[in-house]
From Swiss-Prot:
It comes from Amolops loloensis (Lolokou Sucker Frog). This is Temporin-ALh. GO terms for biological process: defense response to bacterium; defense response to fungus; innate immune response; killing of cells of another organism. It is found in: Secreted. It holds the Pfam family FSAP_sig_propep. Belongs to the frog skin active peptide (FSAP) family. Temporin subfamily. Its main location: secreted. Residues 1-22 form the signal peptide. Keywords: Amidation, Amphibian defense peptide, Antibiotic, Antimicrobial, Cleavage on pair of basic residues, Fungicide, Immunity, Innate immunity, Secreted, Signal. The modification Serine amide is found at residue 62. Expressed by the skin glands. Residues 23-46 form a propeptide. The keyword Secreted applies. GO terms for cellular component: extracellular region.
Length: 64
């Protein structure tokens, strides 16, 4: 049970760092853009793959 908790904690930590870096990059891009429609499309494109990877990682860990 302990290795599973350790793996989940590591995954959560790495995902938090990844989301933080993406948010900083997104904020920098938002400052350069004027049209909100382009900004929303970019956020959706960036957010969905991250969520997919996170969910697949969690399902892989729970299957072991």
């Amino acid at each position: 049970m302990f290795p599973l908790k350790k793996s989940l904690l590591l995954l959560f930590f790495l995902a938090t760092i990844n989301l933080s870096l993406c948010e900083q990059e997104r904020n920098a891009e938002e400052e350069r853009r004027d049209e909100p429609d382009e900004r929303n499309a970019e956020v959706e494109k960036r957010f969905l793959p991250i969520v997919g990877k996170l969910l697949s990682g969690l399902s892989g860990l729970s299957g072991k």
